[in-house]
Amino acid sequence: MKHPHVWIFSDDIYEKLVYDGFEFTTLAQVEPRLYDRTVTMNGMSKAYCMTGWRVGYCGAPKELVKAMTMIQSQGITHTAAISQAAAVAALNGPQDFIEKNNAIFKERRDLVVSMLNQANGISCATPEGAFYVYPSCAGTIGKKTPGGQIIKNDEDFV
């Protein structure tokens, strides 16, 4: 709130890929006073499995969208018409497949996290959404490799 001239760009591409009862919340929902200076970006690649289709969208104050449109129209061609039609169909069509895909992603997440946490010196927190994990190798620092070298840092670990 200290810097009202600063715009906030919120990438909400993973909003539908959440697990274990976690609910996605936008920044503007958490702090409504930020609504008028928040640009929310999203796309079709993650939840709708349309990677490579290059379909995205954003919500922002009208005057900013107008300026963004002027800039975009001068430097980037449009998304293919078939991709646009597919995106509209995906957004307006049945959404039950998202839950099925999330169950598959959750199963994979649980397996990866479990296996990482079984590895000596590795720890990994369970992510609440998306499909990325961020394991820590801190528990290996100071240990020896099978070749007898001491692991001094993350680069030695790799």
Give the residues covered by each predicted segment.
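PLP-dependent class I/II
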Residues: 1-158
